[in-house]
Amino acid sequence: RMLFNNRERFFKYLNCILVGLPIWYFIGLIVANSELIWANALNVQGKVVNGTALMYAYIGLSVGDVFSGIISQVLRSRRKVVFLYLGFSTVLMTYYLFFANGISVQGFYILSFLVGCATGYWAIFVTIAAEQFGTNIRSTVTNTTPNFVRGSVPLITMLFQFLTAQTVS
């Protein structure tokens, strides 16, 4: 209730959630559906296996998380690191959707790894969410923000399907 009865606090909370959405867009929609959707859509040369694509993405997530912490220490700013990672994610998504047609299966797995690296700012995302609020609601925000982000995958999927249907027809 304390999060929702103050407009400024609510929008701060909503912004914290929105920062984490690209992570699960990439992992929950793009990489998790590599074999069923993206391998055919991108005309991947070879057989893509979801488990392998997810493995490379999660290795990338781990690498990205380590480097996001190091970079935030060097830059002395978590916010700059999140913007840097979001920019890297945008570049990779543009490549993924518009320029990866006919990619080899090995190239696809490398791309999955890079997507993981680009979305490997989970620890910083949770830390930023926790630091935005005072002691009374910090625990609530720290626990619920990642849950809302993970829980958004069905909504992201429905929106993606809707937009795909609009652009294909």
Give the location of each predicted region.
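Hydrophobic core of transmembrane alpha-helices in multi-pass small-molecule transporters
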Residues: 105-120
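Extracytoplasmic gate region of multi-pass secondary transporters
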Residues: 8-62, 153-157
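A late C-terminal transmembrane helix in Major Facilitator Superfamily
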Residues: 130-166
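Interfacial helix-cap and linker-helix signal at transmembrane-aqueous boundaries
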Residues: 38-39, 71-72, 160-168
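Intracellular juxtamembrane helix-capping segments at the cytosolic ends
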Residues: 120-133
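Cytoplasmic membrane-interface "Motif A"-like loop-to-helix N-cap segments
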Residues: 74-87
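Helix-to-loop junctions at the C-terminal end of transmembrane segments
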Residues: 64-77
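C-terminal ends and interior cores of transmembrane alpha-helices
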Residues: 87-102
